[in-house]
Design a protein with these regions (language model features):
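Active-site bordering "gate/hinge" segments
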Residues: 1-300
Length: 300
């Protein structure tokens, strides 16, 4: 609360190094709502583009870490090698491999040209081919299934009662995704097709995340091919009108919630952040009961 709105934008990006873009997007969308300002269509599409690239990065990173915790270090190394592809693409667009600083109040400060569009399409083709291999591994490899199938079970009813969100909830059959329930940024123009599973075990959580990668590849291609022309920013007052609002976006791991209160000055009176991992902690006990200690790293 001691920093200006613009200074806070860079602070919010550093709440999470893996999902810095969605944190800044949640913040700017909330501030823009208070100021009654809407970013131009091209800026909204770029916000969605970077968000989906960030989701790809997060899911591949998660796949590698989970594989490592289960003792599958070859899958860990292969997936993290492929993760470099999307990190290079994010660097091509923003200049940074982490903390992309794409958002500004009122729009974005990065754009994509024809060369970058070609690189994005080639990157999606490569990653899609690799992801097909990962899906085959997590659904057909007997050794892998021995560590994931019927492990860490959470039923639809339990997920509903515990408020599970993100891929964790969707792996138990919950139709919860902020991009679908309350579309923001470019999602009204480039909507998602939600991915769910019913089993509610570790295997289902792997499958949901990997299938979400295919959906992100589709969205990136669609945005690249149909991105609207126009400005990247619109004017926004330095002093944000008095009021309070909430801003919700779908981070890679679930709903990210921002509460923002303005007192009419160039500084916020209050900003409260609730991350998706905090919501999913409530489900850990349910998914862990009856399993071995060695299963806990993958369950977590």
């Amino acid at each position: 609360e001691s920093r200006t709105w613009t200074q806070d934008l860079y602070l919010m990006e550093r709440v999470c190094g893996i999902c810095s873009h969605v944190h800044s997007m949640a913040f700017v969308l909330g501030v823009e709502k208070l100021a009654n300002v809407q970013a131009p269509p091209r800026a909204q599409a770029i916000r969605e583009l970077v968000a989906e690239l960030e989701r790809i990065h997060s899911h591949i990173l998660w796949l590698g870490v989970a594989a490592h915790e289960g003792g599958f270090d070859t899958l860990f190394m292969f997936s993290w090698r492929d993760r470099e592809t999307v990190m290079d693409l994010l660097e091509t667009i923003s200049g940074n491999r982490v903390n992309y600083s794409a958002n500004v109040l009122g729009g974005v400060k990065v754009d994509i040209n024809e060369r970058q569009k070609d690189e994005l399409l080639r990157g999606m083709d490569f990653l899609e081919e690799r992801t097909r291999h990962y899906l085959k591994v997590v659904t057909e490899d007997d050794t892998f299934l021995g560590r994931t199938r019927n492990i860490g079970m959470m039923t639809f009813e339990e997920a509903t009662r515990l408020g599970a969100i993100g891929p964790t909830g969707r792996a138990s059959g919950l139709l919860r995704d902020v991009r679908m329930d309350s579309p923001y940024a470019g999602y009204p123009d480039f909507p998602i097709q939600i991915v769910t599973a019913k089993a509610g075990d570790l295997e289902a959580r792997f499958v949901v995340r990997i299938k979400e990668l295919f959906e992100s590849y589709r969205l990136v291609r669609e945005i690249v091919e149909k991105i609207p022309s126009g400005d990247l920013t619109t004017k926004i007052p330095r002093r944000i009108p008095e009021g309070e609002t909430v801003s919700r976006v779908e981070a890679p791991r679930g709903e990210l919630f921002y509460y923002i209160k303005s007192n009419g000055t160039d500084r916020p009176e209050r900003v409260k952040v609730r991350t998706p991992s905090l919501c999913n902690w409530a489900s850990v006990l349910t998914t862990a009961i009856g399993h071995k200690l060695a299963d806990m790293p993958m369950i977590l």
